[in-house]
């Protein structure tokens, strides 16, 4: 995924009201940007450090700028835009980067499924294979090189695990795919210290036949894309 037009830098001042952040530009002026991340953004907020934002040509938007990347004090880059995760996975699937998920003929997004009124992020289908239901999660919480999910108690995430277990029980292929949008994360684990119920459900999911994958992103101010798999420590 290329950032077009090019991202612009600024210094993070503060995030507030979940969806807004104040940014200082290189000329000293300040703007407010949209924050496209509904999570806690734990360990992703570094006031005074450089962030990168995109600019929309849509004049009807209240906030023309969108926060895309955050630079950490160690120089790592974090993909803040959690909404990019599904598009990154679709791009990687089309290029054959996710080797565990090749050989399907069709890809559909946001398809209704399960018994808890859910929509699957990506559904892969092929006449010669069982359908593959993929739930995508963006992982940005990093502690000592270890990535964790979720970064706050996630009832929605728990529901998605139950739905995946249900699909696996029906004989379908069910996959949980972590998109690692933090260049300092080398492996992913459930955040049992934050959401123990999610961690328990994840272990149960694996025993029930749900596959768990994680792919690290290569990130720069010019582009972001899935690059290589990394371990998941359930």
From Swiss-Prot:
Pfam families: SfsA (PF03749), SfsA_N (PF17746). InterPro entries: SfsA, SfsA_C, SfsA_N. It comes from the Bacteria. Transmembrane segments: none annotated. NCBIfam families: sfsA. Belongs to the SfsA family. This is Sugar fermentation stimulation protein homolog. The gene is sfsA.
